[in-house]
Every structure is written in C-alpha cells, then in structure tokens.
Curated annotation (Swiss-Prot):
Protein location: Cell inner membrane
Record topological domains on the Periplasmic side: 26-252
BP term (GO), one: protein secretion by the type II secretion system
Protein's recorded name: Type II secretion system protein N
Membrane spanning residue stretches: 5-25
Function: Involved in a type II secretion system (T2SS, formerly general secretion pathway, GSP) for the export of proteins. Required for secretion of cholera toxin through the outer membrane.
Keywords: Cell inner membrane, Cell membrane, Membrane, Protein transport, Transmembrane, Transmembrane helix, Transport
Length: 252
C-alpha cells in the first residue's frame, strides 16, 4: 500500500512538473494582472522558456524579451530566470543577466545594461544644451532590493568613446570608468577619466532621504580646445595642480 502511494505521489509530481514546463506562456501570462503601464505582445514559447516580441513600459518600446526559468531556484522558493531584452528597442536600451524574486524581494546578478549616451542625455534636465556621443554600459555584479533603493549592490559604470558637444565646442573624454556600491540604500559612485584634452575625477553619494553630495575636479590638458579655454575665466581659480574643483550638495 505504501509503495502504491509513493508511486502515485511520484507520478503526480512528474505530471504536474510536465504540465508547468510545457504550459504555453500565452495561457499562463494572460490572466495575470501586469503592473500599470507594462504591455507584453507577441508572447510565444512556454512558461519555462519563452519570449515576447514587444515589451512597452509607459508607452516606451523596450524591444523583445526572452526568458529561461531556473528549476533549481524554484526548489529554494525563488522565481529566477536568465533574461535578455532590447532587440528592436526604440531607445536602443539592451540588457541581459539573471533576475529573480525571493523571500527578501527582487534581486539581480551579473546583469549588463547598455545604452547610447546620445539617448541617455535626453532624459537629463540640463541647464545648458549638450549632446553626447559614445556608449554607456552598466555591469551589476549583484543587487538586492531594499527600500527605498537597495539593501546591497555593487557594480561598475563605463562610458566608452565619450564625447560632449556644446554650442561653443566639443570635448573628448575617452573612457570614463566608475564603480558604485550600495549599503542600506546609501549609494556611492566614484570614478574618473583622462585624455590629451582633459582629466577628471568625481565622487558622488546619495542618502536614503534623497540628500546628495558631489565632489569633483577637472584639469585642462595640453590639447584642451581653444574655444573652451575662453570659458575658464568664468570659473574660480584652479588649485596648485591646475585642477578646477567642484563641490555641491542638496536634495533631489
């Protein structure tokens, strides 16, 4: 009798697993209430391994989405998947990596985001007209959610082939590299760059209550554009090493 019950439980488990694995993604996702502003169209594949031809968030096209759920994570009470998105995105934002939801909330590991700098700068409230060239890449080694920003996170942000253009001239920045960390929603970002035109370093911090502090300096190098040199007279005097410092703090 016990053996029959055991076989029955085993058969039921295998059957349920097979149903879940082969359940069409369209059938599984259609009844679910998606967050307001999120739209998924062209859903294909299974709940386990599928894709959406188009993802839209608040009216913005994010391109396609592919996912591959991890069975091992489900056994630990977590919903985890490898995802890739961005092909066909109107903003050219692309991303890939591991995302999941556990008992402690959302998380991500080894996640990479890529976006043209020309697109990113349009989202910033700049006091003067600027254009940017190059590619932004954010590599998130690990992220653990915690109100309001993150319980823990670390990674890097790189801006390759960086260039800023203004009505009075362009500045070649080369590669701007920075590292970021987060502990208890205290976010810090530190980095710098150097080219034949200019060198700089910066250090930013953001508190959970949205207070921020920024410290930075830049130094004109030998090939600093002549059209921009004229504007240096409007700045405070540089220090003994020829660096122009900036310090700012406030509330976002």
């Amino acid at each position: 009798m016990k053996r029959a019950v055991g076989y029955g439980l085993l058969f039921s488990t295998v059957l349920m697993t097979s149903v879940v694995v082969h359940l069409p993604a369209q059938v599984a996702l259609s009844p679910l209430p998606l967050p307001e502003g999120l739209e998924l169209t062209g859903i294909e594949g299974t709940l386990w391994q599928g894709q959406a031809a188009q993802v839209r968030w608040q009216g913005m096209s994010l391109g396609d989405l592919n996912w591959d759920l991890h069975l091992s994570a489900l056994l630990l009470g977590q919903l985890e998947a490898d995802i890739r998105f961005g092909r066909g995105s109107s903003t050219q934002l692309r991303g890939k990596g591991v995302v999941g939801v556990g008992l402690s909330g959302p998380y991500a590991d080894d996640f990479l985001l890529s976006l043209p700098a020309a697109q990113a700068i349009t989202w910033l409230p700049l006091p003067v007209p600027l254009m940017a060239q190059g590619q932004l890449e954010m590599a998130v080694k690990q992220y653990r959610f915690g109100e309001p920003y993150c319980q823990q996170a670390e990674g890097s942000l790189a801006w390759s082939a960086a260039q800023l253009e203004s009505p009075i001239g362009a500045l070649q920045l080369g590669t701007v590299v920075s590292d970021f960390t987060c502990q208890e929603s205290v976010v810090t970002l530190k980095g710098g760059q150097k080219t034949a035109q200019v060198s700089s370093e910066f250090n930013l911090s953001l508190q959970p209550d949205n207070r921020y502090q920024a410290q930075a300096w830049f130094k004109p190098e030998a090939e600093f554009p002549e059209s921009l040199k004229e504007q240096l007279s409007w700045l405070p005097q540089p220090d003994g090493q020829g660096r122009y410092p900036f310090n700012q703090q406030g509330q976002l």
